[in-house]
Amino acid sequence: LKNIMPELEVRSRRIGGQKYQIPSEVRPERKQSLGLRWLVQFAQKRNEKTMQQKLAKEIIDAASGNGLAVKKREEIHRMAEANKSFAHYRW
């Protein structure tokens, strides 16, 4: 689950008539819930027969560092990194 849990996320905030994507840290409870949510969500999209097989394959992929849930986490981190210049706007 540690390979899936996000450290940062971006939140939209309207400042001066413009929306900014502001990176912020994720609380530990939210990290865990997002990680589990993504794990189940991407396991459901897999092509194996039963949900047990889908979930097992997604967990194995996440442990090895690939899989859709890990890609989602990397995408979120990339977005936060790209918008790092707006970090001084507090949430």
From Swiss-Prot:
Keyword annotations from UniProtKB, A to Z: Ribonucleoprotein, Ribosomal protein, RNA-binding, rRNA-binding, tRNA-binding
SUPFAM superfamilies found in the cross-reference section: Ribosomal protein S7
InterPro entries per record: Ribosomal_uS7, Ribosomal_uS7_bac/org-type, Ribosomal_uS7_dom, Ribosomal_uS7_dom_sf
Any GO BP annotation: translation
Entry GO MF terms: rRNA binding; structural constituent of ribosome; tRNA binding
Pfam families the record matches: Ribosomal_S7
Any one Gene Ontology cellular component term annotated for this protein: small ribosomal subunit
Family indicated by similarity: Belongs to the universal ribosomal protein uS7 family.
Function: One of the primary rRNA binding proteins, it binds directly to 16S rRNA where it nucleates assembly of the head domain of the 30S subunit. Is located at the subunit interface close to the decoding center, probably blocks exit of the E-site tRNA.
Record PANTHER family: RIBOSOMAL PROTEIN S7 (PTHR11205)
Quaternary assembly: Part of the 30S ribosomal subunit. Contacts proteins S9 and S11.
Official protein name in the record: Small ribosomal subunit protein uS7
Species this chain originates from: Apple proliferation phytoplasma
